[in-house]
Amino acid sequence: MYLEKLRSQNPLTICITNDVVKNFTANGLLALGASPAMSEYPEDLEDLLPYTKGLLINTGTLTNETWELYKSALDIAEKYGVPTVLDPVAAGAGAYRKKVTLDLLHHHTISLVRGNAGEIAALIGESIETKGVDSAQIDNVGELALRANQQLGIPVVITGKKDAVAVNHQVRILENGSELMPLVTGTGCLLGAVLAAFIHLADEDHYWIVWKSPIGLFDRWRNGRAENLTTRNLPD
């Protein structure tokens, strides 16, 4: 139902994302039925954001210059009431990334945060083993998502072998993930953009089903993609 709604609206979705995944993200959103834009200049954002249904801030390509861009984009989005998704790439990998992410969370309006377990744990002062953008799997992902939702005060999505969605002090688990996903770069980054495309459809009465729809759909797609690009094509 929500996929049909999205496709009928063809929502403009602005993605300020990392250099590695821009083409992958744009094509993924086009396949979904959204209209992607990779705008990276404040004056351009001022023109586009009034017509935008969702904004993604992905901190993968992090510099002092992109940090200023994130802040400008969030300020403009808040002015026009555009909901925002934050993907705090490798927030637990070092002090600089954590500082930038916490600055965005504490001084700007973020509608939803999506990350792996290590990234989300870092945002609430907890520690999970990480290596760059990759995070160790944990058994209690739902409990972590719930703690993050309670501390940050916004919906939290943790993705991995098990996905957890925490909203309004409640949590749901989706077991659609795959251990193969880390073998294909950019799948989590694309999901952040997918959530940004869907976010305008979410309201208090339908929050759970809205997020279950894109996450479940995306998990089924990327499971097949990961398997096709890894296991099936490996030589004997």
UniProtKB/Swiss-Prot annotation:
Database matches in InterPro entries: Hyethyz_kinase, Ribokinase-like
User: ATP-binding: is it a keyword of this entry?
Assistant: yes
Q: What does this protein do?
A: Catalyzes the phosphorylation of the hydroxyl group of 4-methyl-5-beta-hydroxyethylthiazole (THZ).
Q: Which SUPFAM superfamilies match?
A: Ribokinase-like
Question: What species is given as this protein's source?
Answer: Streptococcus suis (strain 98HAH33)
> What is one Gene Ontology biological process annotated in the Swiss-Prot or TrEMBL record?
thiamine biosynthetic process
Q: Which reaction does it catalyse?
A: 5-(2-hydroxyethyl)-4-methylthiazole + ATP = 4-methyl-5-(2-phosphooxyethyl)-thiazole + ADP + H(+)
Q: What is the lineage of its organism?
A: Bacteria, Bacillati, Bacillota, Bacilli, Lactobacillales
| Descriptive protein name | Hydroxyethylthiazole kinase
Where substrate binds, per the record, is at M38, G186
Which pathway does this chain act in? Cofactor biosynthesis; thiamine diphosphate biosynthesis; 4-methyl-5-(2-phosphoethyl)-thiazole from 5-(2-hydroxyethyl)-4-methylthiazole: step 1/1
A Pfam family (short name) is HK
